[in-house]
């Protein structure tokens, strides 16, 4: 069997034990195989069969393997249509229907901070002038302390900003001497917290939650469904949940319905309301 097939067979065997979904990892399997090769080298193991034996005799290694399966891929303004819908439909509706002037948003699985900072830019530069009395508090969580450190630093390669509209890039960033682009201080009011979604979540309630390309892609049922239910419980009635481009909410989570005219966005039904 070739090394690639060996790795695929190993992932198909190991991922279910971590309550992770092999189909979700199919497109990024080469990244995981590269990480596994590095881990084998660090342990001085000859092949994946030896690593299987290591997992059998050293249960703590499963935690290491689980960490290797984290996919911190993100970029600014990922899925332009989502941010357009948030700007034109969702956030204005949340402001206009809120019983309070301060909205709360949560970016779940925020990686290096591109998503929460994109939201902060859209809010401050596009929506705050329309709603001067409203405020938006943003909490962002991830399980990886290294990516959170990069998020707090707020420094990015020019390539990660390529999808960001020009006005947001010009007003939101300053180019440094080393070629990095640093988000300006006025847009850095994001509360970054290290949390593993499987173990803890912010209390909420939130008006807006972004959970894209994490739970619904990489976790297997029933853990996936349980996490989505817990996430939905942290949404205010009428609040919005944003998912990834190829994701959909499990049908058993009945309190979430598609937000009309806003692809990839769900709305939480009001308590006791059964219609759309």
Go through each PLM region and give its residues:
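Conserved AdoMet
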Residues: 2-106
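A structural alpha-helix within SAM-dependent methyltransferase catalytic domains
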Residues: 87, 120-124, 232
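Conserved class I S-adenosyl-L-methionine
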Residues: 100-117, 137-139
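Extended basic-aromatic, gly/pro-enriched interface segments that bind polyanionic ligands
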Residues: 108, 129, 134-210, 214-223, ...
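Conserved SAM-binding loop of SAM-dependent methyltransferases across substrates and taxa
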Residues: 112-130
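A short glycine-rich, Lys/Arg-flanked "PGG" loop and its adjoining helix->strand segment in the class I
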Residues: 225-237
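Conserved beta-strand signature within the Rossmann-like core of class I S-adenosyl-L-methionine
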Residues: 237-245
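Core SAM-dependent methyltransferase catalytic element
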Residues: 250-276
